[in-house]
């Protein structure tokens, strides 16, 4: 390759490696930084968990040097006490991942107090005057503790000898040795006894040749159900199976989506939950692009194996979490358009007719915002009798607080009483503009999205618009406080309208909508996005000559592809994107995710991959584009960004590439995250300045 195509590299103050020229007249970065730093406001809380008896609340909140656990009576959160493994009150540790004991008399949690910043271990607090007990001596990555129903054991996920957090979002290890064989890190289910006389290594339950992603105890505490796949775990979640295993026994596969017939064939499964009688396992199943971003239908399968049953087929929502109330009833947390809601699903079994029918109650609550307890996506914390659900919630306009939904009856009519439990952020106002939910028609679909207005919006002025596309694609933008690495609140505070669409392929409108972009990346979904821009321009004072596009991951792909399909965007910022699906197939650490979307491997059907590759249409690109990526990104590897930047530069299109050392797909260094947003703001301000 010619030396003329590359400039000398230089690190900026954040440690990022920048390639190519800066726009001719860069805006004042100090003023942008001042605005961005002013966005950090409000009290940040993490996981929240109600005790099984419904009387106490435990939660995580940020503290000096880490995170701490607080416990309080549900009726009066002001009377909270710190629960900690710290040896002195002034010692600050990182403590998180809560689990209540079934009798509500103890908390299990992870803490790094013994070796601050180095290793977390499992601890047990009986919430009395007795010292907190350390249960384990671990060396590796841990998460997701869960008490056995009899309270005698705590199971958790453990990567022994881990060099990095589990999952594809974390920075990948530098390649070395036999790829795919040497140094593969396997996540297993481990169990520690609560009455252990002294800390020690846990019992490894799941086999060493299976990577476990999530699990659930059987009601008799004798077995586990878990979702697992052959290593390497980062790549194989998309072909994972459902297993059961007796403690001390062998793993038994009860469901393999790749082998079943019907609508679950070849798709993904998540959130396994054992029924109270131990006969059935419920789970979420459907087309999912990322582990942890859960959406689909509610399914059940016999704990002994057999054909799975879809309990919510055709429902125009995306289930994300579930929990059994009885053997015939499930609570389901789901995304419905722009709302998060909790519903009850009834299962009616006619043994004589050999049929199963399901009915859905009206939502127990439906909120135009985010809900969750900090464990899984849209998961809730429930009392043992399921009369109380606790969660944290926020919107674009309201910071997060804890809430309780209490179920009751009056004259045989079921009622829900919702109560705000916390007031961490009372009086905190957003430093950005108001947000509204929009819907528009595209082809045969009704598409939903969110529009955030500029701070100090004046209807008499014309404004620029930035379109921010979410990742996934099987995900959804939900109204929530704050922003991501490319932040709608930040762009709003700087004077832009921001449109965040949920095009086809997103969660929130059922499996048909989620699957509507298969073999069609960049076409129908781009039409949905452009139709959303049309809607915004028709209803709000948008300057059509100042419309930009940005996004991360799948949103980064969409940014790269869109600028080769239309000249509508005046500037673009592509974060961790994909420019060439054919080369990407052989570069990434997660190639299994593409088969359900493209229908075949790139070696069997290269044309369907080329159809959606920006690089194949690069001669049509004219939009100035900033590209950013981490040098250890395994999901969307840096060569994809290099390839796109190189092609634009060769075509004399204004372009810049910034590579961040040590970062994976999800950036963790605060300085890098801030630098990405500052550079994006500068880029847009140069080519389409705010009013």
Description of each model-found segment:
Residues 327, 377-691:
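Serine-hydrolase catalytic core recognition
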Residues 35-68:
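Beta-strand-rich domains and repeat architectures in extracellular enzymes and scaffolds
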Residues 52-53, 102-103, 149-150, 219-220, ...:
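Residue-level detector of Asp-centered blade-edge/turn motifs that repeat once per structural unit
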Residues 73-77, 126-130, 193-198, 246-250, ...:
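Short loop/turn segments that connect beta-strands within beta-propeller blades
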Residues 23-45, 199-205:
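A short helix->beta-strand "capping" segment at the edge of beta-propeller domains
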Residues 42, 61-70, 87-95, 108-123, ...:
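A flexible loop/linker signature enriched in serine peptidases of the S9 family
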Residues 54-57, 107-108, 151-154, 224-225, ...:
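Hydrophobic beta-strand positions that form the internal "hydrophobic ladder"
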């Amino acid at each position: 390759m010619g030396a003329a195509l590359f400039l000398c590299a230089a690190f900026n103050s954040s440690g990022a490696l920048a390639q190519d020229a800066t726009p001719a007249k860069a805006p004042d970065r100090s003023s942008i930084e001042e605005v961005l730093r002013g966005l950090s406001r409000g009290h940040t809380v993490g996981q929240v968990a109600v005790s099984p008896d419904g009387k106490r609340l435990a939660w995580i909140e940020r503290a000096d040097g880490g995170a701490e656990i607080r416990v309080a009576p549900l009726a009066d959160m002001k009377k909270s006490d710190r629960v900690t493994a710290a040896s002195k009150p002034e010692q600050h540790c990182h403590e998180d991942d809560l689990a209540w004991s079934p009798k509500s008399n103890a908390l299990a949690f992870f803490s790094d107090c013994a070796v601050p910043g180095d290793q977390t271990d499992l601890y047990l607090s009986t919430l009395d005057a007795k010292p907190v007990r350390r249960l384990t001596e671990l060396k590796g990555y841990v998460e997701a503790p869960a008490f056995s129903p009899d309270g005698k054991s705590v199971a958790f996920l453990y990567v022994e000898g881990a060099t990095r957090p589990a999952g594809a979002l974390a920075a990948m290890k530098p390649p070395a040795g036999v790829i795919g064989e040497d140094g593969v890190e396997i996540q297993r289910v481990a169990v520690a006894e609560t009455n252990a006389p002294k800390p020690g290594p846990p019992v490894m339950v799941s086999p060493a040749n299976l990577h476990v992603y999530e699990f659930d105890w059987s009601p008799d505490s004798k077995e586990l159900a878990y979702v697992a796949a052959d290593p390497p775990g980062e790549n194989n979640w998309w072909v994972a199976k459902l297993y059961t295993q007796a403690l001390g026994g062998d793993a038994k596969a009860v469901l393999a989506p790749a082998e079943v017939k019907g609508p679950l064939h070849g798709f993904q499964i998540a959130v396994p939950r054992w029924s109270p009688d131990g006969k059935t396992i419920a789970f979420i199943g459907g087309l999912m692009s990322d582990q942890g971003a859960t959406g689909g239908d509610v399914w059940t399968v016999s704990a002994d194996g057999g054909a799975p049953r879809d309990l919510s087929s055709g429902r125009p929502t995306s289930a994300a979490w579930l929990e059994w109330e009885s053997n015939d009833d499930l609570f389901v947390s789901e995304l419905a358009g722009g709302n998060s809601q909790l519903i009850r699903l009834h299962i009616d079994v006619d043994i004589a007719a050999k049929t199963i029918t399901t009915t859905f109650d009206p939502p127990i609550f439906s909120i135009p915002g985010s809900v969750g307890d900090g464990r899984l996506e849209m998961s809730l914390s429930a009392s043992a009798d399921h009369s109380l659900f606790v969660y944290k919630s926020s919107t674009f306009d309201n910071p997060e607080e804890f809430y309780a939904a209490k179920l009751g009856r009056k004259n045989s009519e079921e009622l829900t009483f919702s109560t705000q439990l916390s007031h961490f952020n009372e009086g905190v106002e957003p430093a950005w503009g108001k947000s509204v939910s929009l819907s528009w028609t595209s082809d045969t679909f009704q598409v939903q999205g969110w529009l955030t207005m500029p701070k100090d919006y004046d209807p008499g002025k014309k404004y620029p618009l930035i379109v921010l596309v979410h990742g996934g694609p099987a995900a959804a933008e939900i109204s929530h406080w704050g922003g991501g690495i490319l932040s709608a609140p930040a762009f709003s505070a700087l004077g832009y309208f921001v449109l965040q669409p949920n095009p086809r392929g997103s969660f929130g409108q059922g499996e048909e909508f989620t699957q509507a972009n298969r073999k069609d990346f960049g076409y129908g979904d781009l039409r949905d996005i452009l139709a959303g821009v049309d809607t915004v321009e028709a209803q709000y004072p948008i300057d059509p000559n100042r419309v930009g596009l940005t996004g991360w991951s799948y949103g980064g792909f969409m940014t790269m592809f869109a600028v080769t399909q239309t000249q509508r965007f005046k500037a673009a910022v592509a974060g961790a994107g994909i420019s060439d699906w054919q080369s990407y197939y052989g570069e990434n650490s997660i190639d299994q995710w593409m088969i359900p979307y493209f229908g075949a491997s790139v070696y069997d059907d290269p044309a369907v991959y080329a159809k959606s590759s920006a690089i194949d249409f690069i001669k049509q690109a004219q939009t100035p584009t900033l590209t950013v990526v981490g040098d250890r990104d395994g999901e969307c590897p840096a060569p994809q960004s290099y390839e796109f930047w190189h092609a634009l530069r060769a075509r004399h299109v204004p372009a810049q590439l910034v590579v961040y050392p040590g970062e994976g797909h999800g950036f963790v260094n605060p300085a890098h995250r801030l630098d990405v947003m500052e550079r994006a703001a500068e880029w847009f301000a140069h080519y389409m300045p705010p009013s």
